[in-house]
């Protein structure tokens, strides 16, 4: 059914008064509303979505899902990247103001995509946007829907792609929103066993056609009306398995929902990126739906992330026992199209920040973090880093506070940031780091049997170049590490975590390292 209300105009607030089957009478926001009041208020607001005109037609025409191209993603929380010095207000920058601040930073630092934690309307700041009430409404915390369109348009103007996190698994339990909408379980499961998620939110009932249509429409809306370049689907393992628990079995109807949604999105938006945050080992996440897969373009490699961080937490004298943690990823790597994520989830809830996770004292943490990032960028797979990682922030992320930009006044952090900028530049410049990410001939182990010395060596290849990556994760110097390499007469140094020591040890090799009789001798400082 539908009705028309004479005199309704843009800017007016409204709610639906629902008389429930259980005898309740509750005022609800519009599930399909385009704009909302700022929390704690929750009325929907009539909004004219036809006023804004994008000027990014060239970008939209040329964009594509290029797995043979660099993809370097900077993940941010919109409200805490930077804050205004205004003690009487929230301190948020608007969508338009953030365009002027964030875009130059992304360009200067060498990131070509930004991923925004959920911007769909949500009542609780502490949920970070992952417990939604408005699946079609950008949060009013940072401005209007047209302000968000301005932000995306500005990013495209400066050749920055924009991804947004989308949450198709669950929704907030607030009574004014989707919960018990008509006095019964309308959007959610009626039974308690699967009705609520591990976060206390309501699980969507993906077996209902109306719920499927609602979520598929919402996903398409962000791509169509806001020109987002892709969506990162949150908590996919909680869709695949009942309550995210493999022991409870596959939720076949939710799996078919994912397939239908992804296929529909690909049919309408073939050049948009679909990315899965999935911690399970369910097969075929990035295989096409036609071939029986889930239809995502990329999947986060949570296994690589966990193994890598666990390795660098380990004291150097015990790393030989965990040597395999940095070789195991290549045992399964080609089963999916992976992104290597060091995301917001790794720097909260007492887990410690990336720099804090490194073994050793303050002085030892920095070189280890640098060489860990070099390993990340040399390893096959696209890259994702959360804000603050690039400046070696020691304080865990807090959505109420901006990043600790003041630490850049300290030489260690300033040099770390400079190196990360250089690393991003090296990554983008050299095709061997990204052209053959998902081709088995794009990677080859040279040496993965140096357990006692904590040395790893491998080769990355593209049509134009070969790059050899050598890592020493031990805390002692290796004066003459001999590495076998065939088919070349010399190696040119393109990047080192410690140029000064390398050049001091081999002043004659500042440009080239000679290969003699199929081998090269290299001085490896600690953590290099």
Please annotate each region the language model reported.
Residues 209, 213, 217, 259, ...:
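Feature representing long, continuous alpha-helical segments
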Residues 40, 227-229, 244-400, 428, ...:
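Conserved alpha/beta catalytic core and glycan-binding cleft of carbohydrate-active enzymes
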Residues 1-70, 95-106, 363-366, 379-385, ...:
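Carbohydrate-interacting/catalytic domains
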Residues 135, 139-143, 206, 248-250, ...:
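Short, contiguous acidic/charged loop-to-helix segments that flank catalytic cores in large enzymes
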Residues 37, 60-68, 77-228, 232-250, ...:
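Substrate-binding/active-site clefts of carbohydrate-active enzymes
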């Amino acid at each position: 059914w539908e009705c028309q209300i004479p005199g309704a105009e843009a800017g007016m607030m409204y709610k639906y008064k629902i008389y429930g089957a259980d005898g309740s009478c509750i005022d609800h926001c519009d599930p399909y509303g385009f704009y909302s009041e700022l929390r704690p208020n929750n009325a929907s607001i009539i909004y004219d979505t036809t006023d804004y005109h994008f000027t990014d037609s060239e970008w939209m025409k040329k964009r594509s899902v290029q797995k043979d191209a660099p993809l370097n993603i900077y993940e941010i929380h919109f409200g805490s990247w930077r804050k205004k010095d205004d003690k009487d207000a929230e301190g948020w920058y608007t969508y338009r103001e953030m365009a002027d601040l964030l875009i130059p930073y992304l360009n200067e630092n060498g990131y070509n995509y930004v991923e925004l934690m959920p911007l769909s309307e949500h009542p609780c700041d502490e949920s970070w946007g992952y417990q939604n009430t408005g699946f079609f409404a950008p949060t009013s915390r940072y401005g209007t829907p047209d302000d968000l369109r301005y932000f995306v348009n500005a990013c495209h103007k400066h050749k920055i792609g924009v991804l947004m996190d989308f949450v198709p698994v669950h929704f907030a339990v607030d009574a004014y929103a989707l919960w018990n909408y008509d006095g019964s379980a309308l959007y959610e499961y009626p039974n308690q066993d699967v009705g609520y998620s591990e976060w206390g939110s309501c699980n969507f009932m993906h077996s209902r056609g109306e719920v499927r249509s609602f979520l598929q429409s919402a996903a398409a809306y962000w791509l169509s009306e806001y020109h987002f370049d892709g969506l990162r689907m949150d908590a996919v393992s909680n869709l695949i398995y009942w309550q995210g628990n493999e022991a409870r079995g596959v939720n076949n109807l939710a799996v078919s929902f994912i397939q239908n949604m992804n296929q529909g999105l690909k049919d309408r938006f073939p050049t948009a990126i679909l990315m899965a945050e999935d911690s399970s080992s369910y097969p075929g996440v990035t295989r096409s739906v036609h071939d029986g897969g889930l239809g995502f373009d990329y999947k986060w490699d949570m296994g690589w992330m966990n193994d890598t961080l666990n390795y660098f937490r380990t004291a150097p004298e015990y790393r030989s026992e965990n040597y395999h943690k940095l070789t195991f990823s290549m045992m399964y790597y080609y089963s999916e199209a992976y992104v290597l994520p060091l995301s917001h989830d790794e720097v909260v809830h007492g887990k410690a920040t990336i720099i804090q996770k490194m073994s050793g004292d303050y002085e030892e943490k920095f070189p280890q973090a640098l060489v860990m990032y070099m390993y990340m960028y040399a390893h096959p797979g696209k890259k994702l880093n959360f804000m603050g990682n690039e400046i070696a922030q020691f304080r865990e992320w807090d959505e109420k506070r901006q990043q600790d930009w003041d630490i850049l006044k300290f030489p260690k952090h300033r040099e770390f940031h400079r190196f990360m900028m250089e690393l991003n530049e090296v990554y983008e410049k050299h095709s061997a780091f990204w052209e053959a990410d998902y081709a088995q001939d794009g990677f080859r182990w040279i040496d993965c049997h140096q357990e006692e010395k904590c040395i790893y060596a491998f080769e990355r290849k593209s049509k134009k170049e070969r790059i050899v990556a050598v890592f020493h994760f031990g805390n002692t110097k290796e004066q003459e590490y001999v590495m076998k390499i065939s088919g070349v007469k010399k190696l040119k140094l393109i990047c080192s975590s410690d140029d000064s020591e390398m050049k001091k040890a081999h002043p004659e090799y500042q440009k080239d390292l000679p290969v003699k009789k199929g081998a090269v001798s290299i001085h490896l400082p600690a953590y290099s």
